[in-house]
């Protein structure tokens, strides 16, 4: 199974399944001499951890990262950084009823058809549990990019949308509520709606917006490796993601060029930022901002019609512990994938000219 690695110079390879002994990863290409704050890495993991509030899955995992190599006396050695996160709270029996049944809109059918075998326990390799490894690597990437800030937050849940420009928001409010919305009033409304959805045995989608500040000019490569293209790939690789837009996004299609152009100031900055901090696939020093769309979780506590591996029509109902809405826990994942992209291009940019 290829496709388990991300990045060129700052490269992450992950391994493990949802109900296996552990998940883990190897980070290759991290420069030597970088001081690593392992407590900060763990704090980022805690933000993604299941069971942290009443509106997420109640699977209880400590998600404690254990570094195996590449860090000595608090600094990177330049060798591969290996780490594992042990799985502690698997309940594989919750999935015995889907051993031969395909859950609608899950990876069950496609994995079975492609590989002829699948780990049905929690989705195996297709589970979002794998994203914990991305958070570890992304946290280290953020520490390498010390001057760059990454702030992701929930901007909508279902039809409840935060209609404010990010410049009007106080990012310090993000972690003060379980939804991770920086507007306290909207956060309460979103939280109540998620609880209502959970009570119905249903799920709901939403969006996560990310704002990256103090980005160096020059990150990204022309043509096929544009910065926004790699950000899009990174975000679309996250479980349940259905869409990605940056800068003016689809709203830009409704504007005239005379309205959309970002005019320069004499210092090279721009008076507006509809480009989203990227021009010609290369960062221009302005804020990079984008939005990621997440679908409703496919596992429902309601009865659904589906088929089994023999092609027979059957009825199934979800069991186990699942998120009614993934966006609150997706916030640190979005930040981490953005950090991996920028860290990779930061190292590549070091070789762009002599």
UniProtKB/Swiss-Prot annotation:
Pathway: Metabolic intermediate biosynthesis; chorismate biosynthesis; chorismate from D-erythrose 4-phosphate and phosphoenolpyruvate: step 7/7. Gene3D superfamilies: Chorismate synthase AroC. It comes from Christiangramia forsetii (strain DSM 17595 / CGMCC 1.15422 / KT0803) (Gramella forsetii). Belongs to the chorismate synthase family. Its cofactor is FMNH2. GO terms for biological process: amino acid biosynthetic process; aromatic amino acid family biosynthetic process; chorismate biosynthetic process. InterPro entries: Chorismate_synth, Chorismate_synth_AroC_sf, Chorismate_synthase_CS. The keyword Metal-binding does not apply. This is Chorismate synthase.
